[in-house]
Amino acid sequence: MSKTLIVVISILILGCLAVMVMLAQKTHLKPGDTAPDFTLKSTTGQAVTLSDFRGKQTVVLAFFPKAFTGGCTREMKGYQAGISEFETAGAQVFGISTDDVDTLKRFSTELKTSFAMLSDADHKVSAQYGVLLPVGFAGRTTFVVDKDGRIQHIEEGSAAIEHSGAAMACKRVQKK
């Protein structure tokens, strides 16, 4: 094998490893931390500010990578299917991605979601929450934020596709 080929293969392997490490990074936030405040445009046409919910209700922030992709479609359909669990627990659900509002409106319409989706097109909120991936979209992460604005539960990666963990966390928060 030529030295050039060995160098090229080594660089490719190192590059792949670097990408895998970056993608595996976890949020820097943890349960008990105050959730960073934000204002984002929603699919309802209104801006949503997290701090407006303080003292009122629990909020579920379901970050997802991209509208119209397999995992994200499954995740948002799951939240819609379980929406009554969140409503019973007094929680407001928001799907958040780095897609623009128009794309999220089409996605929400196609899935017939009753909850708003929020556009983080400038990536600032995803970065604040530590979920922005190097490829420019949010990693799949769900945060349950209580009435006091504190993070009570975090799910990341494949666990965040299912709504059940977040729904159970909302029920626990409601009992406090």
Segments predicted by a language model, with ranges:
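Thiol-/selenol-based redox modules, centered on thioredoxin-like
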Residues: 138-176
